[in-house]
Amino acid sequence: MHLLETRDLTHIYRGDVHALEGVNFTAERKSRIAVIGPNGAGKSTLFKHFNGILKPTSGEVLVRGEPITKENVREVRKFVGIVFQNPDDQIFSPTVEQDIAFGPINLGLDEATVAHRVEEALHLLGIEELRERVPHHLSGGEKKRVAIAGILAMEPQVLVLDEPTAGLDPQGVADLVAFVNRLPEEYGMTVVFSTHHLDLVAEMADYIYVMDKGRVVGSGTVEEVFTRPELLTQTRLDVPPIPKLIRSLRENGVAIDMAYTYEDAKKSFLDAYARRA
């Protein structure tokens, strides 16, 4: 049984706009999944089906093997938490602390449990000093962390992040990557995210879905997807700089191991240098 699954999922908006066409997707426990594709590929629409924000035109969405229904959608939203690309879409309380508490309160939790979850979320995102601040006076990166904290306080098993690095400075991106990579092992969570920053995908994901025009046009491990440049080119994407550079070196006769992350690339270059010395 998959933790999260879609079967032949199709969504048509008013005006006969086909946003999703026969999408099949699965997510397992403690996995990190990237969904990549150009603007308009259907990534955000797909994500909104994961916890019942949108209903399929046809096909189905299964959470822990059960279809999402009117009767169980509240439980589904405890299990699958979504952070939208624009944090202003989900931040609305007078203070950061109140905003993070909103979700747990609406789950019907007692005051002590709510307070504990808020403290945990503030600590996990490193935003304890923001607790009394007005959310709409925060920077874009701070708002993003508050939005994530608000979802984490509900303790979902699946965290869905729509373009989580959008609007973040380099340090904010590095912090987010480190944070996402902690969640599966330390908290047993599954993370599904979309991004246009393909250089980050190998740092953050175990598996990739490639979307274009509402369809899944390819999927596989980081290695399987990034060794198919034609797949990325046809979807107006490009192979990230690290594997592109190493592939070029290999094609020019340099004996160097393929790598996809910064740390692996550093090791490959040092090993190649040692062999030539």
From Swiss-Prot:
InterPro entries, sorted: AAA+_ATPase (IPR003593), ABC_transporter-like_ATP-bd (IPR003439), ABC_transporter-like_CS (IPR017871), ABC_transpr_CbiO/EcfA_su (IPR015856), Co_trans_ATP-bd (IPR005876), ECF_ABC_transporter_ATP-bd (IPR050095), P-loop_NTPase (IPR027417)
Membrane topology: Peripheral membrane protein
EC numbers, comma separated: 7.-.-.-
Chain ranges of the ABC transporter domain: 4-238
GO biological process: cobalt ion transport
Residues annotated for ATP binding in this entry: G37, P38, N39, G40, A41, G42, K43, S44
Functional summary from the UniProt entry: ATP-binding (A) component of a common energy-coupling factor (ECF) ABC-transporter complex. Unlike classic ABC transporters this ECF transporter provides the energy necessary to transport a number of different substrates.
Entry similarity comment: Belongs to the ABC transporter superfamily. Energy-coupling factor EcfA family.
Protein name as catalogued: Energy-coupling factor transporter ATP-binding protein EcfA
The species this protein was found in: Methanoculleus marisnigri (strain ATCC 35101 / DSM 1498 / JR1)
The encoding gene: ecfA
